[in-house]
Amino acid sequence: MERSSTSFNFDKIPKFIMKLYKATNNEKYKGICWTPDGLKIHIYDRDVFVKETLPLISKTREFGTFVRMLNSYGFVKSKDIEEEDIYYNKNFRKGREDLLGFDDSLRMIKRKKSSDIRMRIGDGSLKEIVEYLYVQNQELYTELSVCKERIERQERALNGLIEILSRVFRTNSQDLGARIKPSGHNPHNEMDFFLGELSGPLKEGCEPASPPLQDKGIPELSFKPGGIPHADSDTKDDNYDPFF
C-alpha cells in the first residue's frame, strides 16, 4: 500500500537525524555503519566514532550523551547482541530517506508524566508503554554508566596525587634529617640551630682552645753560652743595666 505524500514533511526532520543519516550512509565517516540488513545503525568502534565522527553530528563529545540523544529521538538499543552498540528506529533505514519525515517517530520525545502513562494503559496501548519504559531504562542505565566512569576517573586521579605528595614529603623529610642532627634544643630553622651551636654551653671535659697567655711587661729571657742573660728585643734601651 502506498503511503500518502501528505504524510511526508521533509522540513520537519531534525538536523541531528539528518547528520546521523548522512554519517551512517557515507563510508568516509568512521566508527559507524548500517547493519547488514540496513535496518539498524552499528557503532562498531566507539573510540574512533567519538573522536572523528561524533563532532560532525553533535556538539557533544561524550558517547553517553550521544546515546541519550538517540533515546530521546526514539532509538532503542538492539537486544540481539547486548555488548554491541546497535540501535534502531522503525523509520531510520538504509535507502529510505523518505521515511525520515513520514511521521513523528523521529521527533524529540518529551518525558511523559505518570498520569499520562496510566491513561494510556487504560486505553490499551500497553505495547507503547513498554517500549517507552524500555527507552527510559536505557537512558538511566547510560547516565549511571557515565557517572560511574567519571567517579572512577576522579578516584584514579586523586590516588595518583596522594602518591606524588607522599613521595615529595618522604624525600624532603630525609633531606632535612640528613642536614640537621638532634640537639638539646629545638631550633625553628637551620640558622637558629647554627647560632645556638655557637652560643651554647661547652660540653663536659672540653676546654676552650686558646693560646697561652704571656705578660707583655716581662720580656722573655734567653741565654747564650758564656754570656749574660738578656732579653730578646729588637731595640735596646740606652739606660738598661743588666746588673740592676
Curated annotation (Swiss-Prot):
Keywords: Activator, DNA-binding, Nucleus, Stress response, Transcription, Transcription regulation. GO terms for cellular component: nucleus. Residues 13-108 bind DNA. Pfam families: HSF_DNA-bind. Transmembrane segments: none annotated. It is found in: Nucleus. GO terms for molecular function: DNA-binding transcription factor activity; sequence-specific DNA binding. Residues 123-168 are annotated as: Involved in trimerization. Residues 231-244 have a biased composition (Basic and acidic residues). Residues 204-244 are annotated as: Disordered. Belongs to the HSF family. Homotrimer. Homotrimerization increases the affinity of HSF1 to DNA. DNA-binding transcription factor that specifically binds heat shock promoter elements (HSE) and activates transcription. This is Heat shock transcription factor. It comes from Encephalitozoon cuniculi (strain GB-M1) (Microsporidian parasite).
